[in-house]
Design a protein with these regions (language model features):
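Conserved core of the sugar-phosphate nucleotidyltransferase
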Residues: 139-222, 226, 230
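Solvent-exposed alpha-helices and their adjacent loops that cap or buttress functional pockets
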Residues: 2-5, 24-25, 50, 96-99, ...
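A generic "binding-loop/recognition-motif" signal
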Residues: 17, 28, 63, 255-257, ...
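Short, conserved catalytic or adaptor-binding loops enriched in Gly and charged residues
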Residues: 91-102, 183-188, 242-244
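Conserved N-terminal catalytic core of the sugar/cofactor nucleotidyltransferase
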Residues: 2-12, 19-20, 34, 38-133, ...
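Terminal amphipathic alpha-helical/low-complexity segments used for targeting or macromolecular assembly
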Residues: 1-4, 51-55, 73, 154-158, ...
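A conserved hydrophobic position in a structured secondary element of the catalytic/binding core
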Residues: 62, 134, 214-215, 262
């Protein structure tokens, strides 16, 4: 196997309107809603940076400027904090994102699905490199290390694309992308297929896809040719199905806890989890 290239680029599809959280998301992007003291998007970005990504590609929509503002410098705010000797707050504001990390913003012109959103990043992804894709709605508290870093270790060891997986109750498989593993007793799982939100009786397993992927850059070329599928949208799972025809893709059950911050219940659960963690550490 030739030398595995380091994982440097991460794509964040953040163009969704967040209608489940109206009226709050009428003026605030759902990715900027806070879990304790940080917006949801910040957790995913930190996870990507921890895994070594230094080029972050945000696929945005209208009314998402707050995301760019958050990761940009704010000289006026920094000057005020410095003048008032608020050193701790100044340190936090200056270090939201490391100086070596480059943020790029691409507008998705129309909402044609997750696959299309990912494809919007195609001009920045070379076919010979792998790229991370993180869905911020899936907020993951990794045990000892972030989910993407766990995946990156599998990628670096094998050179194969990696998808994060979680087992769910069979009654819930219709809510997720579901994979067909070659052998459920060999980890990480080698995948034979993937399907989007199948009925229970059609599901190949109860191993479901979590919003973390490390995929061969060729996925972009495949998504370009992908026809609209479920819901009239271009599905990322359809592109992955095509990629499976030409290469090995691994499924990795991650160590940690996932919160579905795309739902009100999951968002509340995440706030309770991280809030209690802060209190246990003596935070305020």
């Amino acid at each position: 196997m030739s030398a595995v290239k380091p994982l440097r680029k991460a794509v964040f599809p953040v163009a969704g309107m967040g209608t489940r959280f109206l009226p709050a998301t009428k003026s605030v992007p759902k990715e900027m809603l806070t879990v304790v003291d940080r917006p949801v998007i910040d957790y995913a970005v930190r996870e990507a940076v921890e895994a070594g990504c230094d080029t972050l590609i945000f696929i945005t929509g209208r009314s998402k400027q707050a995301i760019a503002n958050y990761f940009d410098r704010n000289p006026e705010l920094e000057a005020e904090l410095e003048a008032k000797q608020k050193k701790e707050a100044l340190e936090i504001v200056r270090n939201i994102i490391p100086s070596h990390v480059n943020c790029i913003y691409i507008r998705q012109a129309e909402p044609l699905g997750l696959g299309h959103a990912v494809y919007c990043g195609a001009p920045l992804v070379h076919p010979e490199e792998h790229v991370a894709i993180l869905l911020p709605d899936d907020l993951i508290d990794g045990h000892q290390k972030g989910c993407l870093q766990q995946m990156n270790e599998v990628y670096q060891r094998t050179g194969h694309s990696v998808i994060a997986l979680e087992q769910v109750n069979w009654e819930d498989v219709h809510q997720y992308g579901v994979v067909k593993p070659k052998d459920e007793h060999v980890m990480p799982l080698e995948l034979e297929g993937i399907v989007e939100k199948p009925k229970r009786e059609d599901a190949p397993s109860n191993w479901t896809v979590v919003g973390r992927y490390i995929l061969n850059g060729k996925i972009m070329q495949l998504l370009e040719k992908t026809q609209r599928g479920a819901g009239g949208e271009i599905q990322l799972t359809d592109g992955i199905s095509e990629l499976l025809k030409s290469e090995t893709i691994l499924g990795m059950p991650f160590s940690g806890k996932r919160f579905d911050c795309g739902s009100k219940a999951g968002f509340l659960e995440a706030n309770l989890h991280f809030g209690l963690g802060l209190l246990k550490r003596g935070g305020r």
